Design a protein with these regions (language model features):
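Active-site-facing substrate-recognition patch
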Residues: 1-56
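Short, well-ordered alpha-helices that flank and scaffold nucleotide-derived cofactor binding pockets
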Residues: 47, 51, 77, 81, ...
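Conserved acidic residues
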Residues: 60, 118, 146
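Short, well-ordered alpha-helical microsegments
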Residues: 69-72, 131, 154-158
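Short, glycine/charge-rich flexible loops or terminal/linker lids adjacent to PRPP-binding catalytic cores
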Residues: 73-133
Length: 175
């Protein structure tokens, strides 16, 4: 797919070594922790969601597995650069930090912004094996997840989103 979007063109350039790597998730983390990569990644994710009719305002929270904290932060900063408000919460293993929100059994499940009554999108770049668990845990707080975004095309994430009845989006990183 040909594009003239400067963010997507920059992401394609930055992501080329990532896609050739035997461990693309580790390389994705490196990319999102770089100044140029973080700025581009946040805008790409927001733009992808907008292309799927999910603009900030339709959601006010991004939920991410803890391994995707840098991507969640990139989205927050990109939204702020557009004059928009976006918060984030990280899904944690049962033994998360003391500052996390607890579920009914006292297990810590989320860290970051409060979830109650929020509408969220889910980032799916690292541990989406927890997708169903994240969806159920968010639901306990009255949080509705309306979409799923990934910087790396991921068939498992696409399948999860389809089964959950939510939009899935990922950029076309090839030419």
């Amino acid at each position: 797919m040909t594009t003239h979007d400067p963010h997507l063109l920059t992401l394609r350039t930055l992501a080329a070594p990532l896609l050739e790597s035997p461990n693309p998730l580790a390389r994705l983390n490196e990319l999102t922790l770089s100044a140029q990569g973080a700025a581009v990644c946040g805008h790409i994710l927001i733009d992808l969601l907008e292309e799927h009719d999910l603009a900030i305002g339709d959601y006010d929270l991004v939920i991410a597995p803890e391994g995707d904290a840098a991507l969640a932060a990139a989205m927050i900063h990109a939204a702020g650069g557009r004059g928009l408000d976006l918060d984030a919460a990280l899904f944690l293993p049962a033994q998360g930090p003391a500052s996390a929100i607890n579920n009914a059994e006292g297990e810590r499940r989320f860290s970051g912004s409060p979830l109650s009554g929020r509408t969220a999108v889910l980032l799916a770049n690292s541990a989406l094996a927890d997708g169903e668990e994240i969806l159920a845990a968010a639901s306990e707080y009255g949080t509705e997840i309306v979409g799923c975004a990934s910087l790396l095309p991921d068939e498992a994430a696409r399948t999860f989103a389809a089964s959950a009845g939510i939009a899935y989006c990922s950029p076309a990183l090839g030419d």
